[in-house]
């Protein structure tokens, strides 16, 4: 008996893969011959929000999939974020997916849980399939507990597939894990400084884009957040600094000489 769709597209960040993701995969496979999974936020540096790289997430997806169906029914692609241009991001998704399409019946599946799910409406050429909430389970909650120092990873057993649990158990305590825990602790402590204020503070920062002889000036961050990552030179503006002036020119000149 033929299925309703030739393929169904499932977009997510999968940070990490959890039981609700698996439930959506199962539903998609009931409705289509093939499932195309789009991994978002590709090539992001490790952070509390994006702790796992594309290869790690693809591995989690494939290992969970093996419990559901055969590999030939699954295609996986990845796309980078385009923070300031949703349309450019949508084009990138379509360019990644289109070569994999067979037949005319394509669906896109997901759960519209909040305003962050707006992307599900950006592909009118694909039939939207609403997935009801399986359980009140969010990857952000999993990350919050998992990357808290001293957490017993056994709490994950009830919310992620066995293969994801095995991966997270191996990842736990490693250098990448400790880096993210340190980032989380820094951010949490930073926010605590202002928790009792009647209004949230507004900080103004500015970075410089310096081009010299066809090269763009970059620095390596020496402190958290983002310690060890590349960045444009800049930072907080002084209280009386002109916001249009941006970073101190002498600072940039010094960096160029070095």
Short names for language-model regions:
Residues 14-15, 237-239, 244:
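Short strand->helix junction
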Residues 1-193:
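Nucleotidyltransferase catalytic core that binds NTPs
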Residues 48-52, 233-238:
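Short glycine-enriched, charge-decorated loop/helix-capping segments at active-site entrances
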Residues 134, 139, 227-229, 234:
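Generic secondary-structure boundary/loop-capping signal
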């Amino acid at each position: 008996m033929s299925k309703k769709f030739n393929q169904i597209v499932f977009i997510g960040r999968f940070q990490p893969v959890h039981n609700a993701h698996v439930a959506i995969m199962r539903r998609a496979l009931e409705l289509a011959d093939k499932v195309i999974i789009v991994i978002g936020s590709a090539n992001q540096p490790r952070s509390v929000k994006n702790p796992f790289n594309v290869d790690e997430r693809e591995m989690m997806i494939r290992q969970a999939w093996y419990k559901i169906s055969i590999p030939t029914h699954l295609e996986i692609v990845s796309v980078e974020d385009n923070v300031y241009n949703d349309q450019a991001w949508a084009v990138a998704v379509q360019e990644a997916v289109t070569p994999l399409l067979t037949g005319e019946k394509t669906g896109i599946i997901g759960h519209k849980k909040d305003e962050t799910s707006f992307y599900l409406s950006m592909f009118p050429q694909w039939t939207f399939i609403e997935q009801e909430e399986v359980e009140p389970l969010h990857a952000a909650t999993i990350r919050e507990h998992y990357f808290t120092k001293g957490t017993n990873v056994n709490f994950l057993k009830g919310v992620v597939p066995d293969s994801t649990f095995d991966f997270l158990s191996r990842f736990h305590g490693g250098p990448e894990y400790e880096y993210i825990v340190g980032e989380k602790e820094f951010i949490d402590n930073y926010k605590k400084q202002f928790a009792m204020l009647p209004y949230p503070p507004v900080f103004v920062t500015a970075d410089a884009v310096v081009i010299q002889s066809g090269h763009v000036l970059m620095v390596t961050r020496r402190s958290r957040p983002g310690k060890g990552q590349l960045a444009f030179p800049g930072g907080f503006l002084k209280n009386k600094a002109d916001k249009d002036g941006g970073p101190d020119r002498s600072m940039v000149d010094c960096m160029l000489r070095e």
